[in-house]
Amino acid sequence: MDGDIRKNSYDDGSMDALTGEQSIRNFNINFGPQHPAAHGVLRMVLELDGEIVERADPHIGLLHRGTEKLMESRTYLQNLPYLDRLDYVAPMNQEHAWCLAIERLTGTVIPRRASLIRVLYSEIGRILNHLMGVTTGAMDVGALTPPLWGFEAREELMIFYERACGARLHAAYFRPGGVHQDLPPDLLDDIEEWCERFPKLVDDLDTLLTENRIFKQRLVDIGIVTEADALDWGYTGVMVRGSGLAWDLRRSQPYECYDEFDFQIPVGRNGDCYDRYLCRMAEMRESCKIMQQAVQKLRAEPAGDVLARGKLTPPRRAEMKRDMESLIHHFKLYTEGFKVPAGEVYAAVEAPKGEFGVYLVADGTNKPWRAKLRAPGFAHLQSIDWMSRGHMLADVPAIIATLDIVFGEVDR
């Protein structure tokens, strides 16, 4: 059955059906929650035009445990372990904010030795976090070696956690009034020796990634955040420093004894994924310097108490064996807990991911009336839509990696 292709007709007079204008719609896909690059239980509905992201809709709540509500029915000390389970990559930094809030409301002054130990372990937490963030972020864009190197150093830091408090991850080591117990005598030597070796590892990661052509193609000019964007979205931490704003609570609103330490605040210039990566690399070097200074200050500090003895903290064991009042205080402290005077306070620390804050409302009882947790990752994740819009699908994992998101704190 021959015909005339130009007239769209056949010899028998029949015509071809003309295809009407087809409506082309965008392609929707689910990114996660089982995706390895989602950094937890992130589910994102991505609307794609070809391979260009038109819309990214994050669905959170898959790890929601109702932490803030649970905290209202527990004593202040019982609430401490909940803080470990928020950003579980660097647990002690969250405990720090909780302890600071209670200490400000009760007017507790902690011993200097405890303050130095807190600074030391907060910086260990920062390195733990950045090693995880940088190396797994590199793996998301195709570099498989960095995690193998980074996790070796993380393992050594976890052992320092374990030697201080017995737990590798959920430490509950910072306590209202100080820290749970003093450090073993040889631990400071081992931490100092580790600090001497660590810059070599950062140099190796630097050599592997920083000037790597493929790595730069995947990160440069991806997920750009301007200074105005950072302020509008409530960014903190590396997200705001990568855009050129030198905002770090350790310097701008010093807590503990950070004002005694000498360290630099790395600041980016372009606000893209690459600058945020460079900031994290530089922060690891600075944290290492702070750790070395803390070790030297702890050596110079005479051995003394690491808890402010009073109503917030348990008595010494020797006192309990000698004194009935101390035994009663110990029993009451761990059954009823201590009472915090009525009032409200906001305490924030420069956690590795940004400003982690606790807004605590106390009503004079042994339990908090309300505790609001300000997680930095929550503010960062809510802007994933405009950050990834117009980028390729393959750029989304790179953006998520440099946002540095952990779902324990996002979902709470």
Curated annotation (Swiss-Prot):
Subcellular location: Cell inner membrane
Alphabetical list of Pfam families matching this protein: Complex1_49kDa (PF00346)
PROSITE patterns in UniProt: COMPLEX1_49K (PS00535)
Cell membrane as UniProt keyword: yes
EC number(s) per entry: 7.1.1.-
Reaction catalysis annotation: a quinone + NADH + 5 H(+)(in) = a quinol + NAD(+) + 4 H(+)(out)
Any GO CC annotation of this UniProt entry: plasma membrane
Keywords of the record: Cell inner membrane, Cell membrane, Membrane, NAD, Quinone, Translocase, Transport, Ubiquinone
Domain of life the protein comes from: Bacteria
InterPro entries hit by this protein: NADH_Q_OxRdtase_suD, NADH_UbQ_OxRdtase_49kDa_CS, NDH1_su_D/H, NiFe-Hase_large
GO molecular function terms noted in the UniProt entry: NAD binding; NADH:ubiquinone reductase (non-electrogenic) activity; quinone binding
Mode of membrane association: Peripheral membrane protein
Assembly mode: NDH-1 is composed of at least 14 different subunits, Nqo1 to Nqo14. The complex has a L-shaped structure, with the hydrophobic arm (subunits Nqo7, Nqo8, Nqo10 to Nqo14) embedded in the inner membrane and the hydrophilic peripheral arm (subunits Nqo1 to Nqo6, Nqo9) protruding into the bacterial cytoplasm. The hydrophilic domain contains all the redox centers. NADH-quinone oxidoreductase forms a supercomplex with ubiquinol-cytochrome c reductase complex (complex III or cytochrome b-c1 complex) and cytochrome c oxidase (complex IV), which stabilizes the NADH-quinone oxidoreductase complex.
Family indicated by similarity: Belongs to the complex I 49 kDa subunit family.
Purpose of the protein: NDH-1 shuttles electrons from NADH, via FMN and iron-sulfur (Fe-S) centers, to quinones in the respiratory chain. The immediate electron acceptor for the enzyme in this species is believed to be ubiquinone. Couples the redox reaction to proton translocation (for every two electrons transferred, four hydrogen ions are translocated across the cytoplasmic membrane), and thus conserves the redox energy in a proton gradient.
Official protein name in the record: NADH-quinone oxidoreductase subunit D
Encoding gene (name): nuoD
